[in-house]
């Protein structure tokens, strides 16, 4: 079994890529709401989304069903060690 330091966290890699590349996303919540915008930051429990009208939204990950990027995201395991916020 891999150690926790060597484990690849696909969720963090995905969120970091869409954040760094300013890829617009649609966040589908478990209650059916859709939120569109840019990922500005994230941690273990939350995602900060900047909506199209520049409003910042703090979304708890347990409320998220799906995140759909507007364009394909290239995954790179080396991105997991980069910092999460600019």
From Swiss-Prot:
The keyword Electron transport does not apply. One of its GO terms (molecular function) is RNA binding. NCBIfam families: Hfq, PRK00395.1. Transmembrane segments: none annotated. Signal peptide: none annotated. It comes from Thermoanaerobacter pseudethanolicus (strain ATCC 33223 / 39E) (Clostridium thermohydrosulfuricum). This is RNA-binding protein Hfq. RNA chaperone that binds small regulatory RNA (sRNAs) and mRNAs to facilitate mRNA translational regulation in response to envelope stress, environmental stress and changes in metabolite concentrations. Also binds with high specificity to tRNAs. Homohexamer. The keyword RNA-binding applies. GO terms for biological process: regulation of DNA-templated transcription; regulation of RNA stability; regulation of translation, ncRNA-mediated. Residues 12-73 form the Sm domain. Belongs to the Hfq family. One of its GO terms (cellular component) is cytosol. The gene is hfq. Keywords: RNA-binding, Stress response.
């Amino acid at each position: 079994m891999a150690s926790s330091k060597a484990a690849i966290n696909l969720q963090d890699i995905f969120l970091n890529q869409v954040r760094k590349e300013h890829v617009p996303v649609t966040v589908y919540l478990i209650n059916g709401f859709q939120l569109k915008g840019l990922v500005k930051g994230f941690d273990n429990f939350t995602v900060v989304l900047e909506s199209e009208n520049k409003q910042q939204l703090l979304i708890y990950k347990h409320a998220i069903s799906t995140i759909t990027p507007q364009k394909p995201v290239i995954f790179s395991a080396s991105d997991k060690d980069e910092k999460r916020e600019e």
